[in-house]
Amino acid sequence: MAYFSQQLINAVTLGAIYGLIAIGYTMVYGIIGMINFAHGEVFMIGAFISLIGFMICSTLGISSAPVAILLVLLMAMAFTAVYGWTIERTAYRPLRGSFKLAPLISAIGMSILLQNYVQLAQGARPKPAGSIIEGGYTLFSTDGFDVRVAWLQIIIVVVTVVLMAGFSWIIAATPLGRQQRACEQDMKMAALLGVDVDRTISLTFVMGAALAAVAGMMFLMYYGVVDFFIGFLAGLKAFTAAVLGGIGSLPGAMLGGLLIGLIEVFWAAYFSSEYKDVAAFSILVLVLIFRPTGLLGKPEIEKV
């Protein structure tokens, strides 16, 4: 029971990180019907910017962890927002209206470009970050085994819940959210009604990139290391989470992230850590076969 409980805590933490990345995928898909396959690299860049930010805070003598985290978070979100806007402006907008494979190929090319750019700039070796927040709370002990939740795990889950609620409110109750929903329903009609479609899509990419930055910083703090390749695997798992939950649905993206986290952690804990990725991606195949719209997704209605 103690071992199971500890793995459950670890799984929820990892699932929260995947869920934050998955929301970026699902927001973009919900409006333009395309997958931003460079989103994983934005997450990776957010982690690297966070690493640089923590190094700057250390150099400036900022020893307060909350202050350093807040400053680094704002810095990472600002930088990745620029990357998100640039990706939309260069890889998607010029190809809007072309055949559907064109933006997909362009996004994959952008992903490879960003990955190699970071590799050349930061090197291929993993970069350690050290411990940012230490300590935790022991929930209970049994059979000589302590079930602990780290303060960082609590922070990750709380931040994820707050951001999930905040973005849901933005989409449901703000002018930008109404414009996003209008573009999702019918982009041409939204433009005729006065919605600035280009601006709305760009802001959606910016919002998704900012969430990826938060996930990148949480990943860096949780695992204490970052390299140029983390965006590829984490991005694929987050995409799997978005499809599993129902791509286009924010609650579905978070649910999918939690499920992927549970599958990955419990498979590694009870079976083999070597095949945890196989187990996670097998879920994608099964979902596409038996429920293509995902757990919370709505079936698409084609107009004729």
Please identify what each model-predicted range represents:
Residues A47-I52, L73-Y83, I108-V118, V157-S168, ...:
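Hydrophobic core segments of alpha-helical transmembrane domains in multi-pass membrane transport
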Residues E41-I45, P94-Q119, G231-V243, L259, ...:
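Pore- or pathway-lining transmembrane helices of multi-pass membrane proteins that form conduits
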Residues M1-A22, I49, L60-V72, S98-A102, ...:
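Membrane-interfacial amphipathic/re-entrant helices at transmembrane-helix boundaries
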Residues Y18, I69-L74, A78, F205-A212, ...:
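Transmembrane alpha-helical segments in multi-pass inner-membrane proteins
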Residues P94-L95, P103-A173, T200, F266, ...:
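Transmembrane helix-bundle core of multi-pass membrane transporters
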Residues F4-F54, T86-A102, L244-L250:
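Single transmembrane alpha-helix segments in multi-pass membrane proteins
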